[in-house]
Amino acid sequence: MTNTAARRSTGEAQLLPLPSIYSLTLDELKEWLVAHGEKPFRATQIYEWLYGKRVTDFAEMTNLPKRLREQLASAFSITTLKTIVKQTSKDGTIKFLFELHDGYSIETVLMRHNYGNSVCVTTQVGCRIGCTFCASTLGGLKRHLEAGEIVAQVVQVQKALDETEERVSSIVVMGIGEPFDNYDALIKFLRIVNHSKGLNIGARHITVSTSGIIPKIYQFADEGMQINFAISLHAPTTELRTKLMPINKAYPLPKLMEAVRYYIEKTGRRVTFEYGLFGGVNDQLEHAEQLAELLKGLKCHVNLIPVNYVPERNYVRTPRNQIFAFERALKKHGINVTIRREHGHDIDAACGQLRAKERKEETR
């Protein structure tokens, strides 16, 4: 049994830490300061220390009065994540397995592109959606992450990039968990990382993906955010989608498409449909024709995903020539489509794989 598993089984490290200051929006921090007799402008100074200088100790915030630094230290923590495993791929992709205060672990991935560095963040410890092709759902949902724990992932990766004077240029919320199942923390996270005084990641450089929790799609559309939005679709018909994604029983495909149309009409923004290709399951030309019919007339983009092999699942990769044929079939119908570039194929880069491997080690 590893130290992580031992802590969870014995109760060690189970004491709740102080609330993470990373969980506070700038307005919430201003409110806290005013309530404690301080000027609201101090919030901007604190944000600069947290997200500009990325300090991890309130004592280092030297332009704040000592009394305020002490008050902050007694009221909040600055979340730091312990790196358990760090895997680096030949293509530069880096996968981190971070340990949380209670011993649970989460994954965060840094992906290198010719246009910058993208971070894929996790929103939950585990997942309850139950997609039959995904390693994230193995073991079920353990708990939601606090907004500060999601923010801390980006900060941690940015600190690693500081060593080479690089920066995080985009964020994808596509790691372990269903973001809309942890909606309030997600929205707070988005507001913090997008804020010009926070991590200052432009809204159009942030993408949120959902498996299709329909009420939250309507709510997200009404938020008025310019965040990129993606649907994990993976099947063009109700029957096939239900086999791949049990959530389709609760939120069936026709209703999902109604919600997508509402989102497009409300925001004027394009929706991306993620479509993982599984050999012999959803990758035939008839599936491409069905998908084109489903998406006809929509302001959308299809992202075809060559799937990573997951040992605990039985799906196999679609051959490259078949992926290209699928792409051509969609283009023939005027569908905007790309094939996702593979990242970290030589490491445990599929969502949840590294954490699943760690869980196996813990049970030995």
Curated annotation (Swiss-Prot):
Biological processes, Gene Ontology terms: rRNA base methylation; tRNA methylation
PROSITE patterns registered for this protein in UniProt: RADICAL_SAM
InterPro entries: Aldolase_TIM, Methyltransferase_A, RlmN_N, RNA_MTrfase_RlmN, rRNA_lsu_MTrfase_RlmN/Cfr, rSAM
Protein name, entry field: Probable dual-specificity RNA methyltransferase RlmN
Gene coding for it: rlmN
Binding site for S-adenosyl-L-methionine: 177-178, 209, 232-234, 308
Protein function: Specifically methylates position 2 of adenine 2503 in 23S rRNA and position 2 of adenine 37 in tRNAs.
Keyword Protease: no
CC annotations in GO: cytoplasm
Keywords in alphabetical order: 4Fe-4S, Cytoplasm, Disulfide bond, Iron, Iron-sulfur, Metal-binding, Methyltransferase, rRNA processing, S-adenosyl-L-methionine, Transferase, tRNA processing
CDD domains recorded: Radical_SAM
Homology family: Belongs to the radical SAM superfamily. RlmN family.
Localisation per UniProt entry: Cytoplasm
Annotated binding of [4Fe-4S] cluster, by residue: 127, 131, 134
Top-level EC class as recorded in UniProt: transferase
Cofactor descriptive note: Binds 1 [4Fe-4S] cluster. The cluster is coordinated with 3 cysteines and an exchangeable S-adenosyl-L-methionine.
Cofactor(s) the protein requires to work: [4Fe-4S] cluster
GO molecular function per UniProt: 4 iron, 4 sulfur cluster binding; metal ion binding; rRNA (adenine(2503)-C2-)-methyltransferase activity; rRNA binding; tRNA (adenine(37)-C2)-methyltransferase activity; tRNA binding
Top-level lineage group: Bacteria
Active site as annotated: 107, 351
Pfam families from the UniProt entry: Radical_SAM (PF04055), RlmN_N (PF21016)
Stretches assigned to the Radical SAM core domain: 113-346
Catalytic activity: adenosine(2503) in 23S rRNA + 2 reduced [2Fe-2S]-[ferredoxin] + 2 S-adenosyl-L-methionine = 2-methyladenosine(2503) in 23S rRNA + 5'-deoxyadenosine + L-methionine + 2 oxidized [2Fe-2S]-[ferredoxin] + S-adenosyl-L-homocysteine; adenosine(37) in tRNA + 2 reduced [2Fe-2S]-[ferredoxin] + 2 S-adenosyl-L-methionine = 2-methyladenosine(37) in tRNA + 5'-deoxyadenosine + L-methionine + 2 oxidized [2Fe-2S]-[ferredoxin] + S-adenosyl-L-homocysteine
Organism of derivation: Geobacillus thermodenitrificans (strain NG80-2)
Annotated disulfide bonds: 120-351
Primary subcellular site in the record, as a coarse category: cytoplasm
